[in-house]
Amino acid sequence: MANCVRCCCWLLVLMLMALAITAAVVFVRYKNGEGVFPFPGVPGAVDHKYADALAVALQFFQVQKSGKLVNNTIHWRGDSALDDGKEAGIDLSKGMYDAGDHMKFGFPMAFTATMLSWSVLEYGDAMRAADQRDSAIDALNWIMDYLVNAHPSDDVLYIQVGDPKADHKCWERPEKMKEKRPLTKITPKSPGSDVAAETAAAMAAASLVYKTINKTYSSSLLDHGERLFAFADKHRGSYTRTFPELSAFYNSTTYQDELLWAASWLYHATGNHSYLAYATGKNKDFADLGNPRYFSWDDKRAGTEVLLSRVSFFASQGSDVAQDDVLGMYKQTADAVMCILLPDSETAAFRTEGGLLYVAEWNSLQHPVASAFLAAVYSDYMQSSGKTELSCSGQGFSPADLRKFAKSQADYLLGSNPMKISYLVGYGDRYPEKVHHRGASIPEDVDTGCDGHKWLETSKPNPNVATGALVGGPYKNDSFVDERDNVMQNEATTYNSALVAGLLSALVSTSSLARSLS
């Protein structure tokens, strides 16, 4: 009897050792870009460089908050814009200021929420390992409360608070604002499919985040998302065609990409195949499949292609979804997007000498950060689904190659660049000190109104640090001028922060992704 017990004990020990060795081998293979990391996946060791940067990046959302602040962690910020929306009988006091001004632009704010949600959905475990998930959800909640209130009925969406021309003439702290803040709304007679669909995407994505946190809130968000999508699709038109004066700020080139983007998110949120059919049916022409694009607040096509590729990557073999030719075309286009991002690919896009993917002069960091996030996500889709190779003009690349590209862009913005400067304010020993930001540039004890331009014009560093701000970034020659009036390079935006938070979350640790976002 004793011998049997000893045998069983040794057998158990051997089994545990075998499991440990297997897990170690799989983990090493994953780290080297090989094999499949097991589901459901546990975050690997935390990379503290990216975790620390993530903690910094998320603080900018606290800097940008409007309304009655709760648990405020930014000593130089206070309550502001408490009467926003009052003229329409709604509460639009929450939400976030767009950049260094005090405008609430609904289009980029909704995109900010969509990207925050996507990041939490894919990398919530990594965020939790870095103790930052709650911070991300707090920022998301502040925006979603605003967006819900901005949609008081099926065919009405308030898309803007403030007059941008009047706002930009003032240089003042948000807490001291006394100017009128008019409201702009879209209706069936004044359409804005782009901003309505982006808001629908934000609602759908956020509903997935809150599904395990607050089911009632999640259901409400999804209801708003479905109604907004119906509104956007039925009453088609671009908001910057309806309101031409707004084209100088966030000009929407087309609303078609937002309709596909929203339908894709609604499919993930509901499982309703009618939304997938919307993107793969006659509306597929909106995607311009076969022609890779860069992802941004204006152009959602690359994001949609990656998001729908998720369906293909994790579909059961032989299923209708797995055999869908149009979904296959979305994935092929997503492959092509990845190929232009990889520096050793034949179709590689232009890089600066310092290694930054360079697409646009204004806010030059937006495209490389957005692209790096997509590359990290795509790498993890490949890794988690067992796909080991991406073919670019016959040349093979691994998931590790995509992750290496994503890291290179993150490292550049964190200081590994010719200027030896971190473009993430508050991270590292050297970062921009004269960020184009009204609140940061004016001492908190100064009682100034709209005429505080001396704080814009001073050569001194900002008295308040806009921690977490990701500024516009360098020129094509990797140079950067840290001056407050250098709006092109030295202004930060909330959507930049959402993008960099997503990228850093992807790099915090290694883990597999869930097969379903729901």
UniProtKB/Swiss-Prot annotation:
Keywords: Carbohydrate metabolism, Cell wall biogenesis/degradation, Cellulose degradation, Glycoprotein, Glycosidase, Hydrolase, Membrane, Polysaccharide degradation, Signal-anchor, Transmembrane, Transmembrane helix. It is found in: Membrane. Belongs to the glycosyl hydrolase 9 (cellulase E) family. One of its GO terms (molecular function) is cellulase activity. It is an enzyme of class 3 (hydrolase). The active site is at D101, H436, D482, E491. This is Endoglucanase 18. InterPro entries: 6-hairpin_glycosidase_sf (IPR008928), 6hp_glycosidase-like_sf (IPR012341), Glyco_hydro_9 (IPR001701), Glyco_hydro_9_His_AS (IPR018221). The chain crosses the membrane at residues 36-56. Its EC number is 3.2.1.4. Glycans are attached at N71, N214, N251, N272, N477. One of its GO terms (cellular component) is membrane. Its main location: membrane. It catalyses: Endohydrolysis of (1->4)-beta-D-glucosidic linkages in cellulose, lichenin and cereal beta-D-glucans. Residues 1-35 are cytoplasmic. It comes from Oryza sativa subsp. japonica (Rice). GO terms for biological process: cell wall organization; cellulose catabolic process. It is a single-pass type II membrane protein. PROSITE patterns: GH9_1 (PS60032), GH9_2 (PS00592). Residues 57-518 are extracellular. It holds the Pfam family Glyco_hydro_9.
